[in-house]
Amino acid sequence: MILGIESSCDDSSVALLDIKNLKLLYHKKISQESEHSPFGGVVPELAARLHTRALPALLEEIKPKFKDIKAIAVTNEPGLSVSLIGGVSMAKALSVALNVPLIAVNHLVGHIYSLFLDCEARFPLGVLLVSGGHTMVLDIDAAGKISLLAGTSDDSFGESFDKVAKMMQLGYPGGAAVQNLAWQCKDKRRFKFTIPFLHDKRLEYSFSGLKNQVRLEIEKIKGQNLAGATDRELSNDDMADICYAFENAACEHIMDKLTKIFKERSFKRFGIVGGASANLNLRSRIERLCLENGCELLLAPLEFCSDNAAMIARAGREKYLKGGFVKHNELNINPRVKF
């Protein structure tokens, strides 16, 4: 079996995967959401401290199975440097203790393999990766080579939801909170936000402008003056109407570029991965797009959309079969590396 370790941001996770039949023998994740929620986002130093507490506890649970581990797959890129260090250090120490090889796994590649947790990978494949840190459309050829078709010039899809939620003091993470409020919208025509790059041929995403539009509307409702004083607070109806308009504009922005890409490329299969892929508005839109283009849609199970060690073990298994091991002194963290 392969041991997978994930600690790229604010989730500590460990998994055991059977190499031959891809059966997930163990998977557990300790989330830090409640600890970071008061701050409206991830506090790196706090995340690092929590990883040093959670990872040893998780590994202690599977200690009786250490003797069956053939390799250790660990996320080493990209992510928060202080978080990555925790997982990589743990993997190195355990690798020495168990005398098993190390496998370095790119976190984003791990998300791709969340589509194939219990089956062999099926390439070629188009992928939309949407998370708190990334927004990109990828093309993966038959050999598994990844090409970037579209990325973001500033905020990511998931990050914009988190920041809008922070403006309304909805806590962290903000994706589910914004989505739930959007469902409560009573006036769907009250707000209409401009969709970024709508008539631009560039295959590029940008969510900072959309986020700023939300901020301006909130300030307008509150009657906020230059000194920061406000006449009133947002009502639940205010927040619901704003969330509805924001979510639809954000999803429409994704779909605008994605539709252009579908016209240029004939995908036989297309997958949605990443924590923000759990957004039901976005999922339903992409389902329609794939149906209209005769394309098979692949979806990761909702519980494995966010960061998890199962996908890291699964991606590591591919490298294991090809002998893709890394020496201890060559396993470094790369916070900003993508592909």
Swiss-Prot record:
Entry's Gene Ontology BP terms: tRNA threonylcarbamoyladenosine modification
Cofactor note: Binds 1 Fe(2+) ion per subunit.
One GO cellular component term noted in the UniProt record for this chain: cytoplasm
UniProt entry keywords in alphabetical sequence: Acyltransferase, Cytoplasm, Iron, Metal-binding, Transferase, tRNA processing
Main subcellular localisation: cytoplasm
Family recorded in the similarity comment: Belongs to the KAE1 / TsaD family.
Protein name stated in the entry: tRNA N6-adenosine threonylcarbamoyltransferase
Biological source species: Campylobacter curvus (strain 525.92)
Organism ancestry: Bacteria, Pseudomonadati, Campylobacterota, Epsilonproteobacteria, Campylobacterales
